[in-house]
Amino acid sequence: MALATRCKAPAAVCAAHSRRSVKVSAHKGAFEQVQVAAAAVAAAALLASPANAGVVLQQPELKKVFQDDAPAPAPVKREFKGLAPPSLPKPVEAPKPAAVAAAPEKKEEVKESGSDLDPRSIALPGALALTIGGFFAASKIDTSFNEWFIEAVVKDSNNYAGYEATLKTDAGVVFPKAATAGTKKVKAATGSKKGGFPFGGKK
């Protein structure tokens, strides 16, 4: 009996211990599940909410030192639409006359009484007639007027033009002597007295 009770007692203690451990492990498992669920809910909330940490991520812009920053102009497309007709100027409309225009006052023209002869048409013929008449009158009054007028108008050629220095001598004009030796030789060669060459066989 004692041995049986001794054997039963550890078995009961072992069963009680095993029950407690199962309960503790059950409590621990439930607590861990609650923690995992809370962590999952917190992670989901953090992932769903936007991150406002105050840090702005921006890529640095590289500057092109040797290139123009201005954008390249777009190519212009040229379309040939044919030759356009020449543009004619618009006709200018004449100003319309006023409906009631004041009649201009007529000025009385005063005609001067007198001859309608233009003095310029008489000036030239009168000057010519006066000059010729004066010349004839002076020649009739003074007989030496004609000589004086001719000497005044015509150049004196008694002293020549001034360039013929060899012709100016005290004795007057000196003409060169005619060379007769040549003509005599020609006459002797041809056999004619008058000189020249015989034509037609006559000597």
Curated annotation (Swiss-Prot):
What is the topology of this protein in the membrane according to its UniProt annotation? Single-pass membrane protein
**Lumenal-facing ranges:** 54-120
Q: Which residues cross the membrane?
A: 121-141
Stretches of the chain found on the membrane's Stromal side: 142-203
Q: From what superkingdom does this record's organism come? A: Eukaryota
Region annotated Disordered, chain positions:
79-118
Task: Provide the Gene Ontology terms for cellular component.
Answer: chloroplast thylakoid membrane
Q: Which locations, inside or outside the cell, does it occupy?
A: Plastid, Chloroplast thylakoid membrane
Cysteine-cysteine disulfides: none
Keywords carried by this UniProt record: Chloroplast, Electron transport, Membrane, Phosphoprotein, Plastid, Respiratory chain, Thylakoid, Transit peptide, Transmembrane, Transmembrane helix, Transport
Q: How is the protein altered post-translationally, as described in the entry?
A: Phosphorylated.
Bias type Basic and acidic residues, positions? 104-118
- The organelle transit peptide extends over 1-53
The record's principal subcellular location, in a coarse class, is plastid
The record's function comment reads:
The cytochrome b6-f complex functions in the linear cross-membrane transport of electrons between photosystem II and I, as well as in cyclic electron flow around photosystem I.
Q: Which family does it belong to?
A: Belongs to the petO family.
Q: What is this protein called?
A: Cytochrome b6-f complex subunit petO, chloroplastic
The opening ranks of the lineage are: Eukaryota, Viridiplantae, Chlorophyta, core chlorophytes, Chlorophyceae
